[in-house]
């Protein structure tokens, strides 16, 4: 996927996920990083849609931050500066997001596609999180279609 396939907001979310990875000294961007980046933009579409669904985006973001803090850290000589990897699980979510965008006949991958990709291809930990908040594609799509 090329950078041109993403909207400005989705590029910002990916950059925020990378920055979070650096701040927490993780070696790779995980689904937790990306989900947190999507939820932490208070004026963003994803928090607005979750609020519309009766969810509390700030509470979910706080839980994600706790999950990120527990991820393995890489410090010292083992860490290559400015070298951040994307986990296979994020890659799977991005591919799912691209496929969703194509099915929706959208030219660009936007934040809602990224979020739906995370819902469609979650890791076990993320599936548990989404289940705990009763968030899935079936509940998210009606909120998305209402905007």
Enumerate the language-model features and the residues they cover.
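Histone-fold recognition with a strong bias for associated Lys/Arg-rich disordered tails
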Residues: 1-147
């Amino acid at each position: 996927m090329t950078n041109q396939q993403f909207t400005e907001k989705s590029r910002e979310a990916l950059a925020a996920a990378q920055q979070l990875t650096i701040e927490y000294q993780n070696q790779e961007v995980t689904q937790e990083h990306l989900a947190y980046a999507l939820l932490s933009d208070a004026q963003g579409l994803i928090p607005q849609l979750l609020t519309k669904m009766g969810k509390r985006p700030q509470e979910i973001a706080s839980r994600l931050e706790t999950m990120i803090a527990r991820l393995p850290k890489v410090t010292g000589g083992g860490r290559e500066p400015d070298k951040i990897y994307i986990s296979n699980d994020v890659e799977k979510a991005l591919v799912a997001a691209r496929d969703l965008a194509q099915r929706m006949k959208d030219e660009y991958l936007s934040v809602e596609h990224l979020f739906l990709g995370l819902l469609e291809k979650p890791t076990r930990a993320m599936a548990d999180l989404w289940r705990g908040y009763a968030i899935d594609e079936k509940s998210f799509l009606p909120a998305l279609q209402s905007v």
